[in-house]
């Protein structure tokens, strides 16, 4: 058996640009035969600012993930915690897989730091993947600070120049990932996704399987 996993998903619960609440997201992915979703809501100064306590900011960020997580058994879809972080020095976005709630609470003002600092903090326990590196306004980051590149962002509402991301991946030793950059129901891809040979039981296993390349990227 093989398992479809969404690698890039935003909820209306936590991301202002999201158009669909967590439960409706799970319903839609169940209808499209997915087995897992990595919730990667936006985590940035633009979204959360610095006028609230860090605890309240993290609470708000985690809302979409937690609302989805408690519905896992109802929809038979595994939910994994991730994020799409943007620092204040550029418009680049980075998907981070494997993070824990504790990590977020302990590292105050994480999005006010830098990619280099995040790499140090991750201690190779998490995966840092540059999302849509060739979308307008984005530039390819220092490859030494990345674990992977999103080589196929299938969002129908943005031009991501995936061919350039794929070429950059081919010239590197980085991990390739794929995701629909979900914001609305029409984003879900029926033909392009990450397909795992086994369903990761938790975030740690998800990271391990991706590092070991125990998945393939399905394309049209």
Sequence positions of predicted segments:
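Active-site-adjacent beta->alpha loops and helix N-cap segments on the catalytic face
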Residues: 61, 108-117, 159-167
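Binuclear metal-dependent hydrolase catalytic cores centered on His/Asp/Glu-rich metal-binding motifs
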Residues: 92-125
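Charged catalytic cores and adjacent phosphate/nucleic-acid-binding surfaces used
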Residues: 1-7, 11, 15, 21-27, ...
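Aromatic-lined carbohydrate-recognition surfaces of secreted/lumenal glycan-active proteins
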Residues: 83-84, 126-134
